[in-house]
Design a protein with these regions (language model features):
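Acidic, aromatic-enriched beta-alpha/helix-loop junctions
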Residues: 35-84
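Amphipathic, interaction-prone secondary-structure segments
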Residues: 13-36
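Eukaryotic intrinsically disordered, low-complexity regions enriched in proline/serine/threonine/glycine
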Residues: 2-21, 42-47, 119-120
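A contiguous, well-structured "functional interface" segment within a domain
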Residues: 1-8, 66-70, 101
Length: 131
């Protein structure tokens, strides 16, 4: 696992894998404002599914929700978040949409953003006020 600590920023590459000509990268980032999970893909499957050669999605949640996310991912809170995310996405065919469904089912609020060649789409956390 690669990590970088820069002031109030910590970034962990929790999963990087290639399958054929496709690549998938999952990154966990801790900031003063909370936790971010980035999910990036590129390759033929991404192009076929989304009409873009690459796609990067990001889920943002408050640090106070970390224990709830670890429990939803791993079934207990003793695992670290990076390990729980790595284990979750190491399962065959697990996509970011599966994580969003899991968080919705567990009642864990989050904000979502996605960027690809077509532009950027954002969904703020329910109840958040856009500035």
């Amino acid at each position: 696992m690669g990590d970088t600590g820069i002031g109030l920023l910590e970034r962990y590459v929790v999963l990087r894998e290639r399958c054929g000509g496709d690549e998938r990268v999952v990154v966990l980032e801790r900031r003063a404002a909370g936790l971010l999970v980035y999910y990036g893909t590129r390759g033929e499957q991404t192009s076929e599914a989304f009409g873009s050669a690459w796609r990067v999605s990001c889920v943002r949640l408050g640090e106070e929700r970390e224990v709830g996310l670890v429990c939803a991912l791993h079934g207990e809170s003793s695992a670290g978040l990076a390990d729980a995310i790595r284990s979750y996405f190491s399962q065959s065919d697990t996509e970011l949409s599966d994580l969003l469904d899991l968080m919705d089912g567990a009642g864990i609020p989050y904000a979502y953003a996605c960027a690809d060649e077509g532009g950027i789409v954002c969904r703020e956390e329910a109840g958040a006020i856009a500035s």
